[in-house]
Each structure stands twice: as structure tokens, then as C-alpha cells.
Amino acid sequence: MRRTFSQLATRLLKSKDDELKSTLKYLTKGPVKLLGPLFESSEVNEQGSLLNRSRTKENNLQNHHIENILRILNSNLPEVESKKQKVAVHYDVLFSHLNSIVTQATDNKSSSSKELQGSSSEDLYDRLLLLQYVGKLTNVRQITEILLSKKFNKFDKVWEHRALFDEYQRVVISILLYYRTHDVQIRKDYEPRWLSDYSDLPFPLRRLLWRCLTSNVSEDNIRQNIIHYIKLLGANWRNNDLILIYQSLYEKSHILPDLTVLNHNKDDGFSFTQNQILLVRILRAISKCVEEEPKLVKKWLIDIVKLSIQSKIMLESPKKPSTPIMDQYKFIRSLDISIRSIHRTCQDKLIFEDLQVNLGSVLKMINEEEHELKTHLPLNLI
């Protein structure tokens, strides 16, 4: 302690303050026991003063030196307020730069789907969290593009930090993660929410959900499984969703519930538009041949499903016009072209003989529907 205060000698001796010099002399030459009060609490000092009332004068002198010592020590402390201001300015600048980096990194315009496909799993995971932190994770498509990316594999991390997302986002994430991992616990925890929130899910996610609900279900039981979930959905179910199921499970169309299975719902009936009936009939006929030439037949199915999605066939209703007549006509013309192409291919292959016959009947239905739609088109468009 004496050595510590002696180091201040040069500074103090240059001072004209005689009191400081006196204090330094008191510390360097006085008995060690006199230093004790410097490290005692005020309570201890008060107790000492009570026990040594006879030494009041000496204690006053000692306290005077203590005040001088404290003044010396405090004079060597940094200027806290000015330092705090400098640190605050530093962090303001730092976070301003960070905000700029994050904004640029999460800008939807600068991050196309192709760029996401080239990102690593770690980059995709970081992007998902960044979007959420800055409040830019605003739609299902953003989550879907990341979690369904072929390179993404941070499934456990996302599930571990699911509390960072709101309730609806967690439902979306649970569907996507179950689709990728088939984690039984995820389905056990969230299947009730999948059904209760079904009507709030966008169509692409509903299609994915039906793949989840029918995963690990044998072909013999898939029809009954779907009917079971239709009943569980209750008021959330719409008959048009059966078209969506066909779009989702197109490879198994021939074993899915037929359109007439919905006649139990008297309020909604089981009526479908002619385009919807054609779509289901085509998918059921073609899907029977998947095992014959899987690659070719799957391509046919995918092309037809894509066409039906682009034309929004699911939204058509026999009760009221829900799709512009021109869109319906475009679909039937495109469908005619696709089916004729498939029909020509079947002519050269014996294994597709039955399919060729079925598609021949379908082409007749397509022609009839095309003529019917033409009667509703403006003359200048015919």
C-alpha cells in the first residue's frame, strides 16, 4: 500500500497543496495500523469511534487524511460520462452499419429463388432467422423456399428455436419440417393445429399437408384415410378441396376417393364443374399406368396438374361463375393439346392400349366442353 501511494509522490510533490503533501507523508511514514480505516465500512468506523472516544482529535485528523486520499484516487478515475457518450456513438454507428447489412441481406428484391438454391444450409438458416428478427418474414412462401431447399438440413435447429416464430408460423414450419423429416413427435404435437387451421393455409401448403397426412399409409387404406380426415376437418372442409387432393397425390389418383364420395354433404352437394370432372377422370386414367413407365407417366401427370393449378381449376364452382370464362376456355384448349399428345404416344405402345381408349372418350368430352364454352365467349374472341 505504501509503495502504491509513493508512486504518486512525484505528482503530489509538484502540487502546491500542502495538505496533500501532509497526507502523503502520513501514509509513507506512519504506522501500518493507521491504514486500516481506509478499508473499513462507515459502520466499523462508527463502532471504532464509540470505543475510542478519548481519541476524537486523532480520529478527526485521520478522517481528514482519508478525505484527501479519496480525492487523490478519484482524480485518477476516467471521465465516465464522456467515455459513455463515446461508446454510445460507437455503437450507434456500428448498429447503423449492421442494420444496413441486414436490410440488404433480407431484401426480397436482391434474393431470388435461384440465389437461395445456391446458398448453403447455414446461410439459409441464418437468413430465416434474420428475416424473422427484422420483421420481414411476412409470408408462407419465404419460409417454404428456405425449408424445402434441397441444401437445407438445419431441421433440428429450426425446431429447437420455434419459439422465435408466432403461432401461425409455427404451424407452417411444423408441416414443412414433418414433410422433410417425418418426425413423429412433430405430427403428434401439431396435427390438431393442422386441421383447425386448415382453412387458413394457402393452397400449396394444403397440397403438402395431404402428402403428410397420407404418408406411410398403404394403398389399400389411403381412400379410407382421406375420408377420415375429411370428416375431422368438419366446417373447414370444402368439396373443392378434393380437387386439391388429386393435384397433391396425382400418382395415386386411381385409388383416391371418387367425386361422388362427397354426397354426404347435402348443403354443398357433390357437384363439380365439367373441367374439374375432366381433370379427375384424366388423372385417374393415367395414374393406373405409373408402374408401366414411371418416368414418362409421371411427366404426363405433372404437366396436367401444373396446367390445372395455373388455370385455378380448384376455384371453379357449378353454382356461380368463380373463374373468368376465358380462363376456363384456355384450360380446355390446353388440356385438349396435352391429351392429344399423350393419345398419340399411346398408339405406339401396347401397354397403353387401355389408356388410349380412355383418353379417346376424354377427348370427346373435351370437344363438347370447348363448344359449350365458345357459346359464352364474346364474338370477337372466337
From Swiss-Prot:
The keyword Mitochondrion applies. Its main location: mitochondrion. It is found in: Mitochondrion. Keywords: Mitochondrion, Transit peptide. Residues 1-12 form a transit peptide. One of its GO terms (cellular component) is mitochondrion. Signal peptide: none annotated. Component of MIOREX complexes, large expressome-like assemblies of ribosomes with factors involved in all the steps of post-transcriptional gene expression. Associates with the mitochondrial ribosome. Present with 981 molecules/cell in log phase SD medium. This is MIOREX complex component 5. The lineage of its organism: Eukaryota, Fungi, Dikarya, Ascomycota, Saccharomycotina.
